[in-house]
Amino acid sequence: MVVRRILIVEDERLIALDLQRRLTQLGYTVVGVVASGAQAITAAFQLQPDLVLMDIRLQGEMDGIEAAIQILVDRFIPIVYLTAYVDDATRQRAQATSPWGFLRKPFHVRDLQAILNRYSGELLAD
């Protein structure tokens, strides 16, 4: 299986749109762009992405880690966390979801591509 379908969970609209544009230019299909943890859970179940790019600090009652935990209850979908800042306690909470990676904002598209390539390569090797 190769990563083709990506769900973006990002509450900063400009970052979400930039990510969507860059991923599309790289040949990926962005199946959805949502801004909250609750929307992420619904979209993950309905859209069945190959991977979720999840902001850790989301507006609202649920952060990205809590949303990832809920998504992973139903089925395994790889998560790559996006964050501008993460403390040790937050990183430990995130690690419990076995993420495929962390991207610190601002990040270069090559860093995102490296994670996506690694993920695809590991799946192809299985």
Segments (PLM) and residue ranges:
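Short amphipathic alpha-helix used as the core "switch/output" element in two-component signaling
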Residues: I65-I77
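Active-site residues of response regulator receiver
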Residues: D55-I56, T83
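Acidic catalytic/metal-coordinating carboxylates
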Residues: S36, M62-E66
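Alpha4 helix (beta4-alpha4-beta5 surface) of REC/receiver domains from two-component response regulators
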Residues: V73, V80, V86-R104, A114, ...
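Non-catalytic signal-transmission and effector/linker regions of two-component phosphorelay proteins
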Residues: M1-R5, R110-D126
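Acidic, metal-coordinating helix/loop segments flanking the phosphotransfer/catalytic sites
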Residues: Q20, V33-L51
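Two-component/phosphorelay signaling modules centered on CheY-like receiver
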Residues: E12-G32
